[in-house]
Structures are given as structure tokens and as C-alpha cells.
Regions:
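Short, low-complexity disordered leader/linker segments with a strong preference
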Residues: 1-10, 41
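Short beta-strand segments enriched in small/hydrophobic residues
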Residues: 7-27, 83-84, 152-158
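Loop/turn elements at helix/coil->beta-strand transitions in domains of secreted/extracellular proteins
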Residues: 7-10, 47-51, 74-79, 98-103, ...
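An alpha-beta-alpha
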Residues: 17, 121-190, 209
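Beta-alpha junction/loop-to-helix N-cap segments that form part of ligand/metal-binding clefts
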Residues: 23-28, 42-116, 188-195, 217-220
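Short, intrinsically disordered, charge-balanced linker/junction segments flanking boundaries
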Residues: 208-220
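Short, polar/charged alpha-helical segment
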Residues: 23-45, 169-176
Length: 220
């Protein structure tokens, strides 16, 4: 049967092992390894053992698509864990749903991960273990308005990231609803390292604070 080789059941790990978000993938793999070890030690699968087959997304959506195809077609895994980046989960989702193989993302928060934005139909083989962008954006807007007491916001996002776009959208909607004003919106690209000119432009708009829904490398 698919994913079963004798006494071994193969699970796919579609993870960011290299690239800009490698910290997510590496820590995720460590967690999966530990979980599989404990499951195997308990012997809850009737004597069968789980093994992890990893495909590296290289922190790129296109590579996630290739990796999903490999895990399903070549490695014959029974299910896939990952990726962590929303853009990568969305890109690879058509493959696992088409093949009727379950995928679960630990960190893919964009609503489009589990719901087709065009048809509004739930993707039957895509799942997540985390909250979603509407929740995060709403909470951040509430925190900015009610706790920080700020009125003028700048939004600075990674223009290549569905994660960043989703958070920015829901933050803006709720911040404005709370009586705030978004005075400027700017964007950077993944792997950018020089932000001085844009930050100078943002400073000139005189925001009370800057909302940057991005990944750790560029934000740091």
C-alpha cells in the first residue's frame, strides 16, 4: 500500500531546511523526529514504525511544489507535514489535494491554505494546527489601538509573502475600524538587506508605529 514498506509507514516532511526560513524547517523537523520516536517506542501502530522522508522547500514556493510532487509520486508517503510558509502551502496544496493525500501545516496562517479563494470551497486534504491571519491581524490591531494607544500606523510588508499580505489586510481593516489611520504602506522583497531609503520615507510620514508582518531574517 502507499507509504508502507513492510513494517514501515512513510510520512513526508515538506520543510524549509535551507533558505531564508530554515529556522522554521529545522526546528520543525526536530519536533517531528521526537514525535515519531515516541510513537514508535510506544508501539501503537500494531508493530509498524513511522519513518520521516524530508523534502527541502529551500524556503521557496516553487520548490515546495516540486517537493510535494516528489514525496507523493516517488516516495509514496501516506501524509505530509509542512511547509510552514503560507505561500509554499498554498502553492503545493493543489498537488496533495489532487492526489488525495493529507497535508498539515504547523504555521501556514493564510486563510487560502485551507479554503479555495475562488470557489470558497474547503480544501478536503489541507489542514493546519495554528490560528489564521484574520485572528492575528485583529488581535494586533486591537493591541495597537487599546494597549499602545497609537493612532497613525505605517505598514511595511514582504510583497512576495501571502503570510505578510494576509496579516496586513486584516490589521488594516481592524485598525481603521478602531479609529486609527494608516498613513503609509510600503513593501520590501524577500532577501532584501537594505531598508534605509524606505524607512526614511516611512519616517517622513510620521507614523506612531510601524507594523511589519514578516519573517525573522528581514525583520531582524
Amino acid at each position: 500500500s502507499k507509504g508502507a514498506d513492510g513494517d514501515t509507514i512513510k510520512v513526508g516532511g515538506l520543510l524549509e531546511m535551507t533558505g531564508g526560513s530554515a529556522s522554521f524547517g529545522i526546528s520543525g523537523k526536530n519536533g517531528i523526529d521526537l514525535a515519531l520516536k515516541k510513537i514508535n517506542e510506544k508501539g501503537v501502530l500494531g508493530g509498524k514504525k513511522l519513518s520521516l522522508v524530508v523534502a527541502d522547500t529551500k524556503s521557496e514556493a516553487s520548490e515546495a511544489t516540486n517537493g510535494m510532487q516528489k514525496l507523493i509520486s516517488q516516495d509514496k508517503v501516506v501524509a505530509v507535514i509542512g511547509p510552514n510558509q503560507s505561500s509554499a502551502v498554498i502553492a503545493s496544496g493543489a498537488i496533495n489535494n489532487g492526489a488525495k493525500v493529507v497535508d498539515i501545516t504547523p504555521m501556514g496562517t493564510n486563510p487560502d491554505v485551507t479554503v479555495d479563494p475562488k470557489t470558497k470551497q474547503v480544501k478536503p486534504y489541507s489542514f493546519r494546527t495554528c490560528f489564521i491571519d484574520p485572528f492575528q491581524g485583529t488581535v494586533m490591531a486591537s493591541f495597537a489601538s487599546n494597549e499602545l494607544k497609537v493612532k497613525r500606523a505605517a505598514i511595511y510588508i514582504d510583497n512576495t509573502s501571502d503570510y505578510a499580505k494576509g496579516l496586513a489586510q486584516f490589521f488594516k481593516e481592524n485598525f481603521v475600524k478602531n479609529g486609527g489611520q494608516v498613513v503609509i504602506e510600503e513593501a520590501y522583497l524577500q532577501k532584501d538587506t537594505d531598508f534605509k531609503s524606505t524607512l526614511t520615507k516611512i519616517k517622513a510620514a510620521k507614523p506612531d508605529f510601524i507594523y511589519i508582518p514578516g519573517y525573522y531574517q528581514e525583520v531582524g
